[in-house]
Swiss-Prot record:
Species in which this protein is naturally found: Mycobacterium tuberculosis (strain ATCC 25618 / H37Rv)
Alphabetized InterPro entries for the sequence: Acyl_CoA_acyltransferase (IPR016181), GNAT_dom (IPR000182)
A GO molecular-function annotation: aminoglycoside N-acetyltransferase activity
Oligomeric and partner information: Homodimer.
Protein name, UniProt field: Aminoglycoside 2'-N-acetyltransferase
Class of this enzyme: transferase
Residue ranges of domain N-acetyltransferase in the record: 11-162
Gene designation per UniProt: aac
GO cellular component, one term: plasma membrane
Tagged with keyword Transferase: yes
EC number: 2.3.1.-
Gene3D superfamilies the UniProt entry points to: 3.40.630.30
Residues binding substrate, per UniProt: D35, E82, G83, S117, D151, D152
Length: 181
């Protein structure tokens, strides 16, 4: 068991050299046991990366990127969390909490709300940090117009920053390739 306290370092995608970017991708893909696609990787790019290193190796990662979520007719500026991963031999060391401290700092400084799509396993962690489960229907603003995303209902969590939200209302995300939420 590792007993040190870790702090995540925030780095924008534009400031990652190619070697570090490749190391992140390799670690995240390994942490997801290969269930991390090319589009999943693309979703992590273009924003801020929270990174934790140990002896030069990346052991934990989360990204926050800008998206628009449509809520009651308003396109809200959202910090969307992607690619939360901890190397297998470092799990259980509260590294995800350090990652979330960093991405939530970005959200508080730049966005109206934070959002993410959570695995069943992680929902309790997000709720314990003040994230709210979205109870209303979810959808995506696809190229053909709004499309319901019922498979994502119950997986979305939000962190209101400077806005009040009714979590039983409809919530729509912007379009992208791959998993839209």
């Amino acid at each position: 068991m590792h007993t040190q306290v870790h702090t995540a370092r925030l780095v924008h995608t534009a400031d990652l050299d190619s070697e570090t970017r490749q190391d992140i991708r390799q670690m995240v893909t390994g942490a997801f046991a290969g269930d991390f696609t090319e589009t999943d990787w693309e979703h992590t790019l273009g924003g801020m990366h929270a990174l934790i290193w140990h002896h030069g190796a990346i052991i934990a990662h989360a990204a926050v990127i800008q998206r628009r979520l449509i809520y009651r007719g308003n396109a809200l500026r959202c910090g969307y969390v992607e690619g939360v991963a901890v190397r297998a031999d470092w799990r259980g060391q509260r590294l995800v909490s350090a990652l979330l401290d960093a991405v939530e700092q970005v959200m508080r400084g730049a966005y109206q709300l934070g959002a993410l799509s959570s695995s069943a396993r992680a929902r309790r962690l997000y709720a314990s940090r003040g994230w709210l489960p979205w109870h209303g229907p979810t959808s995506v603003l696809a190229p053909t117009g709004p499309v319901r995303t019922p498979d994502d209902d119950g997986t979305v969590f939000v962190l209101p920053i400077d806005i009040s939200l009714d979590t039983s209302a409809e919530l729509m995300c912007d379009w992208r390739a791959g998993d839209v939420w």
